[in-house]
């Protein structure tokens, strides 16, 4: 072995001796479906959108500042994000 006057790593870093295909995720969790099996899955059916239902409901209503002040933070953010400016009665 060659003598080196400075500190050199004597072992290879972890993973360098393995090919990219052999290196696994650090959690070592086995996937239930392979990549090819997931690609064969039925992607044509999607879950129903909840936002469309709430938008339809909120188009029919108007909101005063008192109504908005009664809402919790999450409900307020969802409402403000889905209603139009003309639905605010106190503006």
Curated annotation (Swiss-Prot):
Entry's transmembrane regions: none
Single Gene Ontology MF annotation? metal ion binding
Which species? Bacillus cereus
UniProt key word DNA repair: no
GO cellular component terms, alphabetically, are: extracellular region
Question: EC no.?
Answer: 3.4.24.-
Its biological function?
This protein is a metalloprotease with gelatinolytic and collagenolytic activity and is a component of the non-hemolytic enterotoxin complex (NHE).
Highest rank taxon of the organism: Bacteria
Catalytic class of the enzyme: hydrolase
Full protein name: Non-hemolytic enterotoxin 105 kDa component
Which locations, inside or outside the cell, does it occupy? Answer: Secreted
Name the coenzymes or cofactors required: Zn(2+)
Lineage, broadest ranks: Bacteria, Bacillati, Bacillota, Bacilli, Bacillales
Chief location bin:
secreted
Note accompanying the cofactor annotation:
Binds 1 zinc ion.
GO biological process entries:
proteolysis
What are the record keywords, sorted? Enterotoxin, Hydrolase, Metal-binding, Metalloprotease, Protease, Secreted, Toxin, Virulence, Zinc
């Amino acid at each position: 072995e060659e003598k080196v006057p400075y500190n050199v790593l004597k072992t290879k870093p972890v993973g360098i001796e393995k090919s990219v295909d052999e290196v696994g995720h650090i959690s070592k969790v086995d996937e239930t479906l392979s990549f090819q099996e997931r690609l064969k899955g039925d992607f044509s059916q999607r879950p129903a959108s909840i936002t469309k239902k709430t938008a339809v409901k909120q188009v029919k209503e108007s909101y005063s500042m008192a109504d908005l002040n009664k809402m919790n933070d999450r409900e307020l953010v969802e409402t403000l994000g889905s209603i139009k400016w003309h639905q605010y009665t106190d503006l």
